[in-house]
């Protein structure tokens, strides 16, 4: 059996020759950025594919999050999860907003709605949940709390491309949803991101903010930044869309194989599927319990020695990093579930090019063979 390196993910790259005509078109257009034709085509194509009304493309998902907060004029305190990539909380700090961490649900690993109300103060202006691993948050419960307290809801939907619940795209919930199109994501544009928004007026404000606040040659309406996606990134996204359904099918096959082959291994708990009608199989997290022969870190090292590079997403918690750990909400006794999960979680390799031999190699290693 092969011993080649297997990483937790690998960017999906369509055949290079299929990308060349897009590049030729860009060269002919002589437009490289500033909302050119590829950018416009991708926005329209994504609205159609995702089933949303309005989407604004960005150069990355973090700038999209930063701009979403600016677009809604969020200030004060925002309730969020400690169990995410650091960009979730960093986007708050960069906007001068105080993140307030709330514990996660032990089954979904998303923000626990039953813990939110106790964290609300007079300074709270919004909730920023994360659809962790692409599993939908309890959007109804979160929205009910937001409505009761007049709070905004901004979803960090970096993992949730293409995910649907019974009513359609999960991205339609809340005031805004921010996506990441980073190379590690299910759908990528090398680097990129987007904000899904409910109406044309909000999209116009977002478009202004991502272009320095410029409206026309003589009018600047806000202190914006440069968050624009280039034509090359947008073109790659258009090509990716032609392949995304096929890529999702392979991800689902890998997910189902893991679930079937690992379900009876003592000490491995598979994170439950989120109840969504359409999943994107972006990650495959497992929890290593006390009755497994190795603890999580020992298994992580064993796999690494075998050239299998799983990842401990998300360890450490955001709340453990120096810029956050002094906050009252970051204290471990406030986040018992998140701390326990962070000490047990391991995300296994999942990507369309992962072949069955390497999949079997991973499973056999987990079985102790």
Model-based region annotation:
Residues 1-32, 349:
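N-terminal "arm"/small-domain region of PLP-dependent enzymes with the aminotransferase-like
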Residues 31-77, 83, 91-94, 101-103, ...:
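Phosphate-binding glycine-rich loop
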Residues 172-208, 231-234:
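Active-site PLP attachment segment
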Residues 37-45, 49-53, 114, 118, ...:
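PLP-dependent aminotransferase class I/II
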Residues 70-157, 164:
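PLP-dependent aminotransferase-like
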Residues 60, 104, 132, 183, ...:
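Short, conserved catalytic or interaction motifs in soluble domains
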Residues 155-189, 216-221:
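Conserved active-site segment immediately N-terminal to the catalytic lysine
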Residues 56, 79, 100, 153-154, ...:
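Structural detector of well-ordered beta-strand residues that form the stable sheet scaffold
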């Amino acid at each position: 059996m092969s011993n080649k390196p297997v990483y937790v993910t690998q960017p999906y790259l369509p055949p290079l020759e299929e990308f060349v005509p897009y590049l030729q078109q860009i060269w002919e257009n002589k437009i490289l950025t500033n909302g050119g034709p590829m950018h416009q085509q991708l926005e329209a194509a994504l609205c159609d594919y995702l089933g949303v009304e309005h989407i604004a493309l960005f150069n990355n998902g973090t700038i999209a999050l930063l701009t979403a907060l600016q677009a809604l004029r969020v200030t004060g305190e925002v309730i969020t999860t400690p169990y995410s990539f650091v960009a979730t909380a960093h986007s708050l700090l960069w906007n001068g907003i105080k993140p307030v961490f709330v514990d996660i649900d032990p089954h979904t690993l998303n923000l626990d709605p039953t813990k939110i109300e106790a964290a609300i103060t007079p300074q709270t202006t919004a909730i920023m949940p994360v659809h962790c691993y692409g599993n939908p948050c309890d959007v109804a419960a979160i929205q009910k709390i937001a409505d009761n307290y007049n709070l905004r809801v901004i979803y960090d939907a970096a993992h949730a491309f293409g995910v649907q619940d019974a009513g359609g795209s999960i991205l339609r919930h809340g005031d805004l949803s921010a996506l990441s199109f980073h190379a590690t994501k299910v759908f990528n544009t090398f680097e990129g991101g987007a904000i899904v928004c409910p109406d044309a007026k909000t999209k116009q404000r977002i478009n202004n903010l991502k272009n320095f606040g410029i409206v026309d040659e003589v009018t600047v309406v806000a202190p914006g930044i440069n968050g624009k996606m280039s034509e090359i990134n947008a073109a790659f996204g258009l090509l990716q869309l032609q392949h995304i359904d096929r890529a999702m099918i392979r991800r689902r096959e890998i997910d189902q194989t893991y679930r079937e082959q690992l379900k009876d291994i003592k000490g491995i708990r598979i994170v439950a599927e989120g109840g969504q009608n359409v999943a994107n199989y972006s990650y495959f997290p497992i929890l290593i319990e006390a009755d497994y022969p190795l603890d999580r870190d020992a298994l992580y090292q064993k796999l690494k020695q075998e050239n299998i590079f799983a990842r401990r997403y998300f360890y450490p918690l955001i709340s453990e990093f120096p810029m956050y750990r002094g906050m009252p909400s970051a204290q471990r006794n406030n986040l018992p579930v998140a701390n326990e999960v962070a000490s047990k979680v391991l995300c296994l390799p999942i990507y369309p090019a992962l072949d069955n031999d390497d999949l079997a190699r991973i499973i056999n290693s987990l079985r102790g063979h």
